[in-house]
Design a protein with these regions (language model features):
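Extended catalytic-interface subdomain
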Residues: 1-11, 16
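Hydrophobic alpha-helical interface faces used for helix-helix packing
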Residues: 23, 27-200
């Protein structure tokens, strides 16, 4: 479906994902689960846009819908064995996005930043700029694009924004750390922490 694809991503070329039986379509957008935990959980307290088998109401966005990311841009996998962008899969980066530890700022080039199943088979193990770590869980993924210098995303109020790779990120804070120690990147990915974001 064209609306789910970014024309700037050279990997969004119609090649289907071969993971878990194959023939899965790819996309370039994923729901913001939370920047505060590893993997997909049904715990809504970490403040993303959604979680497994859960629903969120507008009143739950204490930080404001204009200050909370709903959808992050993702890059499709680099080959048919790379599950990133494969939206039917439950793993982060295939229909959702979470930023945690070394899966940090947009377009992170850390060699093991994306934790995902099938990483070694995909050929991206420890290989920047889309390096990954072979994880037996749903892992972690960061926002990615082929736009120069940053990524696009959709806020909870339906506005779109562009954020640069240099956005403030406190990568050392597991589980986001105390509110006062969070970077802007974490703040805009939580909805109910009472954070003041300011301009970004």
């Amino acid at each position: 479906i064209t609306a789910f694809l970014c024309p700037s991503d050279s990997s969004s070329n119609g090649e289907l994902c071969a993971y878990a039986g194959g023939n899965w379509a790819r996309g370039n957008y994923g729901m913001n689960v939370s920047p505060c935990h590893h993997g997909i959980q049904d715990n809504l307290s970490d403040g993303g846009f959604g979680a497994i088998n859960s629903s969120i109401r507008i009143r739950d966005f204490r930080d404001g819908t204009s200050n909370t990311v709903a959808i992050n841009e993702l890059r499709a996998g680099l080959n048919k064995n790379d599950l990133r962008g494969c939206w039917a899969m439950p793993g982060l980066g295939s229909g959702t996005a979470a930023m945690y530890n070394d899966a940090s700022r947009p377009n992170s080039r850390q060699p093991y930043s994306d934790d995902m199943e099938n990483c070694a088979v995909s050929g991206s193990l420890g290989t920047p700029p889309m390096g990954c770590y072979d994880s037996q869980s749903t892992g972690q993924m960061t926002a990615r694009s082929q736009h120069p210098g940053g990524t696009q995303f959709l806020m909870a109020d339906a506005s779109t924004r562009y954020v640069t790779e240099s956005i403030d990120f406190k990568g050392a804070q597991n589980n986001c750390g105390p509110v006062e120690q969070r970077g802007i990147w974490q703040k805009i990915h939580t909805r109910n922490s009472g954070e003041v974001v300011g301009e970004f």
